[in-house]
Amino acid sequence: GVMRGREFLMKDSYSFNADEACLEETYQTMRNTYKTVLERIGLDYKIVSADSGSIGGDASEEFHVLADTGEDTIAISDSSEFAINTELLLKDGEDISSLEGKPSPDGNGIIQIKKGIEVGHIFQLGKVYAEDMKANVLNNEGKATTLHMGCYGIGVSRLVAAAIEQNNDDKGIVWPHGIAPFDINIIAIGYEKDQKISEAADSLHAELISMGYEVILDDRKDGYGTKMKDSELIGIPLNIIIGKQFIENNEIELKARTGESSSNDIGDTKTILDFFKNK
């Protein structure tokens, strides 16, 4: 599926700093940048203390999107930001299940075991590679000093897969607003037969697009059931249904992908958008 495609996109970057303090500052900047990315998308995630592995270095952290289908097992506190790869917490011979319910090592709350999908990894490499490459720079005193390196990677296409794994139901995808392919789907029932419906759908479509929203107009000849199932499968956050109710009393139905619904006057765009933003 999407998680293990033959092609993937990665964002990799490196930093080269004059000293350890400068590396720490850059590291925190990148850490906060990755946090911003995940928060803007709308994902539930944890920053996990990790083993640097074969890459080496002084410190590393992984960014995990929480999902029951995740390949990694992580231990988190129920009362703080503490999170760590279980392999770093387990003692020889211990089973993962033995960690559940134990006091958190940071003294706050108890340990819970969760599954996560790793979408990012950041490292403080220090001088490990710079020394081998003889990567030196003159400091303020004019003396040669070895650079301190940092390494930062985030899986761009893996973020999409993780978002799907975390946000879905038996009908299909439930996209977070931040990365949904469309914000709104206008389902026009009888578009090709009723001029009142087609004109209203076209007008609302144009208005919402002019306001900066990504909007699709489903003007196919298919019935309501087919159109709604397709929209739920794709995961568009809001459906606006223009059909029989509109012909009878000028009302449209608003239906969020998360299940909430409401009837609304077609001319009250503010209420429509408030409904969208709150779902």
Where are these regions (language model features)?
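NTP/phosphate- and nucleic-acid-binding module
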Residues: 1-279
